[in-house]
Amino acid sequence: MSDANSATLCAIMKRHVFAVACSLALAWSTAARAQLAPANDMGVALGHMHLAVKDVEAHKQFFTTALGGKLVTNGPLTLIEFPGIFVMLRQADAAAPPAGSVIDHFGLVYKDIEAARARWKSAGVKYDVGDVNPNQGYVFAPDSGIRVEVFGDPSLPGPVSMDHVHLFPAEADIKAMQAWYAKVFGGFPGQRQRVARPGVIEVDYFHRFNFSFSAGMGKPAPTKGRAIDHLGFDVKNLDEFEKRIAALGVKFEAPPRVVPNTSTKVAFLTDPWGTYIEVTEKLAPISATR
C-alpha cells in the first residue's frame, strides 16, 4: 500500500465509529506534507476555502495570529496556510453570513486546545466551549458571521491542522451528495463520530480530512455570495480532470484559465445543491507543495 493510501486508511480508522485510534504521524512524514495532502487516486486533494469578507486585514489577522495559519504567496495570490488547506480572502461589502447556505462552517483541530483558548481569551477573540463536549467549540471571525469549529487532539503531530468542511443539505439529499463527491472528486464514503455530541455523521474522506454531511433546515441557499463563498479542490492535471468529469455529465462554467503571473490554472463549477467550487492546478506556492 502506498504511503498516501496508508495515511488515508489511518485517518478513516481513526474517525470511523467502529474503529480504533490510529496515529496520524504517517501523514506528517515529510515537511512537504504539512501543506496540501497527497492527491487521491483521481489526482484530487482538498485545496482551499475562499471567504468573502468586508475587512480583509482583520480576517487575515484572525486566521494567522489567532488561529495559527501562516501567510504565504503564490505570485499575486495571498494564501493563509494550515496543514491540509489554504484559506483565501477577498473583499466584499455585503456578503451574507454562511448560516443557511450549503456550507455552514469548516473545522480545525489543535494539539493543545486549552493553550489555544488561553491565547484567544488574551487577544479578545470570541470563542465558545461545547456544552456536551468541552473539548469542542467554535471560534468566531470578526463581523462576517464566519465560525470555525475547533477541538483538541493531543496526538496531533503539529500544533494545528485542517479537519473538515461541514455541509448542510436537506436531509433527503445527504446520501446523494455523499455519492456525488465520491464520484466526481474521489472522496471515500464513510462515517465519523460527532465531536460536539454523541452520534455519527456521514462523510467523504479526502486523505485524513473529510466533508461532513448533516441535515439542514430545509433546502439551503447557494454558497456563492455568502461569506464562505466557495471551496476548492486542487488537481494534478486540470485539463484531464475536465475531460473526466465531462464524461460524468459535469461541466465547468467556463474553460480553465491561467491566473496571471502564476502557473496556477483555475476553473469553476457548482454542485447540484448550490455549493460553488473552484478547481485549481498548482495552487500551492513552490515552497508549500504537497
Feature names for model-found ranges:
Residues 50-55, 108-111, 167-174, 234-236:
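Short, surface-exposed ligand-recognition loops at beta-strand->loop->(often short) alpha-helix junctions
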Residues 40-75, 79-82:
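Mature N-terminal segment immediately following signal peptide/propeptide cleavage
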Residues 46, 103-105, 164, 227-230:
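Eukaryotic phosphotyrosine signaling hubs
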Residues 54-70, 116-123, 172-189, 247-248:
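Amphipathic alpha-helical segments
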Residues 19-29:
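Bacterial N-terminal signal peptides
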Residues 26, 33-41, 117, 121-169, ...:
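Vicinal oxygen chelate
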Residues 79-123:
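Mid-chain, structured segments of secreted extracytoplasmic proteins
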Residues 1-14:
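N-terminal secretory signal peptides that target proteins for export/translocation
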